[in-house]
Each structure stands twice: as C-alpha cells, then as structure tokens.
Amino acid sequence: MRCTILTLFPEFFDSPLDAGLMGKARESGLIDVALVNPRAYTTDRHSTVDDRPYGGGPGMVMRVEPWEKALQGIEEPGRILMMAPKGRPFTQAMARELAQEESLTILCGRYEGFDARLEEIYPIEAVSMGDFVLNGGETAALAVLEAVSRLVPGFMGKEESGTEESFSAGLLEYPHYTRPEDYAGHVVPEVLRSGDHGRIAAWRKECSLRLTLSQRPDILPEAQLDEADMDFLRGLSRNRPGRNLYCALVHYPVVLKEKNSGATSLTNLDIHDIGRSSCTYGLGGFYVTTPLEDQRRLLDTLLRHWTLGPGSRSNPDRAEALGRIKGVDDVRAAIEDIARRTGQVPYVVGTSAKGAGNATPASVRAMLEERPVLLVFGTGHGLAPEVLEGCDAILRPLRWMDGYNHLSVRAAAAIIMDRLLGDCY
C-alpha cells in the first residue's frame, strides 16, 4: 500500500515511520509512505500557505493553490482523506475499509483549516479522530496510517494479532499476562495456565464481554453477539441509571383542543403501554397524575385488577409492569414522592412536540448520574404552559426535522426512554 501525506511539518513523521513494525514494513516495501510539503508549491519568497479568512474571525486559513498543486503532483492519490474535527469518525471498520485500497492520500490541516474550495475541486473525505482538537492533522494522520497499515496482510506477522484485538468484533480485548506466574502475590489466572484451549477461549470471550459492558457499553449495540453472549451479559452487574429515571403522565393541567388548559380523562392504552415501557427500561417508577376523584377511582380499580385481582393471575408480566404505577394529584406530588424515596429532589424534564427545547438525551443521561430525573409527558395536546415553566429543562422534540411529529404520548414515551437508556443502561 502506498500512502502520501501532505503536511507542513514532514519532520514530524521521521521517528514514527522508522520505528517498530512500521519501519520494517517500509524497509520490506510492504508500506510506502511519501511526505509532501505544500510549501514546495508556493511561488512567493516567503512560501506562504495561509491567509486571513474572508468575513473576519480569528486565525488563518490554508490557501487553495499550494494544496491543489501538491495534489496534482501525486500520480495515484487514491482516496483522499482530510484530517479535520468536522469529519466522519474514524473507526476500526473504516480502517479495514481503507486497508483494501492500493493508494491513500492524507491531508494534515493546520490553523483554522482549509479553504473550502479545495473540497469542491477534489473528492476529499473529512475524517475525525474524535470530539477534541489537536494543533494539526499530523498526529491524527499517523494514527490512521498505523491503524490501516497493521491490517495489510503481512504487516503483523501473525494474522490473528490483527483480528483478535479490541474492536475487531466490536468488543474490547481481553487482558494479557506473561511471566512470572506470581508477581508480589498477583497470580496469573489458573485457566490461562491450564493448557485447555477451549476454556481459555471461553474465558477470554467472557473477559471481553465484561470489560466492554463496564468500560464501553456504548459500543455493545453494534458488537457481534450470539445468544450465549447475551445471556452472559444479562447475568452481570452493571450501572443502571434507568433506576434513577421516573416518568409522569399528566392529565391536568394540559392543553385541550380549544387551546385552553384543562383536564383529560385517563386512557387505558396509555397506562398499560407506558407502564410496560417503564418496566422494560427499568425505570424507578411511573406516576399518573390527575386531581379528579372519579379518575383516581378508575385508576385504582384498574391497578387492583392487574396487580391483585384476576389480571395478576392470568398475566403476571402485566402485573409486574403495572405494579410500578402510582396515582398522584399533580406533578408536585410526584416530585415529593421521589424525594421521599430517594432522599434527593429530582430534575424535572418536560416534553413537547413544539419549540426547540434546551436538553438532549445525552444531557439527560448526565443528569441521571447526579440525581433522579422525572420525565413529564402531557396528554391532550401537550403540557400546559405553567407545567413547562416549572420544569428544569425541556427535551428537544422528537422528529423535529420533519413537519409531522404528531405521536401518541405512549409512542413518544417509549421512544424517549429508548434514546435515553437503549439496551445497556
């Protein structure tokens, strides 16, 4: 594979390209790396490669001319990557994809980045190493080059080395041990000394699963899992922020069809479905709020039937879900009940299909790490203004990019729970 790196600081790569396996791969001709400095393609005596941005603002911007001329000088550029924070996240899957290419070209940005016209002239793919900022693209380019090169056949020597490491199957790698067998009382696990390859493979897989759940649960949804893996993961203890999440279905005050505030009647489907969703996602509780006595009696009758009466015997799963439901007069009563149960006053997060909101699923997950969160859902045409005004935050609406986002409250509740907690939290 041939890789051409365009950089203002070619000396940055001197040591890394000569060290270890990369140095051996270059010596053998397996990997060919060319360093091109765009300053060589400037025409002024100062070798200027940047200039002030149009429209004002801080910093300098890379000029088009020297970079375009440098690209023109590459006989076979192959895919052209630009290391930039705005780019597509670099992953192991992308590394495998790029390892199939015969040629790659990597542009290392500096300052405020490139004149955008360079991307109009060439089919450049912006690639990011993560949500952080570096002084330039050289460090990122080196990471890409190494990740891709080690997947080229022959680079690693033993091919399994590249396929058994972290992320190869969407999981973190298992721990490694070497001699001595006992170091200051820290002993190598017996299974690794047993010589039983089947037990060793099973132990390593379980370690990978355990580490991934503990350290990177966010990558589990895309991991390669079989049914045995899923059974093993279910049996592990884990952080359960969902237990810190509560929801309330508000029937007063809500917006009515006439746009005034008032009360709505309880709906059997809403209670059942949100109750089942709350149980599925492991919420701490589900409150149904209504100050109307006849509606409270109706709720009590329904809950008794499913949790204590004939319904509990015919459908134990439904009994478990509806057993988490509690009727209260209003949102304030739900807040007070959560405070009594947990010793902490919850954050109150409202929901609405209108407006921009000021909270996202990620920010609500962060709240869950601090103290309980009460999600508030409105019936009718949504929560009344006075309820929303009393919330600590309001979630951004679902499907806000499209013109139609008229979901039933039970559908919205299920979607929001899934976005907050997914399969692993």
From Swiss-Prot:
Specifically methylates guanosine-37 in various tRNAs. The keyword Ion transport does not apply. One of its GO terms (cellular component) is cytosol. It comes from the Bacteria. InterPro entries: Alpha/beta_knot_MTases, RNA_MeTrfase_C_dom, tRNA_m1G_MeTrfase_C_sf, tRNA_m1G_MeTrfase_TrmD, tRNA_m1G_MTases_N, tRNA_MeTrfase_TRMD/TRM10. S-adenosyl-L-methionine binds at G109, M129, G130, D131, F132, V133, L134. Its EC number is 2.1.1.228. This is tRNA (guanine-N(1)-)-methyltransferase. One of its GO terms (biological process) is tRNA N1-guanine methylation. It catalyses: guanosine(37) in tRNA + S-adenosyl-L-methionine = N(1)-methylguanosine(37) in tRNA + S-adenosyl-L-homocysteine + H(+). One of its GO terms (molecular function) is tRNA (guanine(37)-N1)-methyltransferase activity. Coiled coil: none annotated.
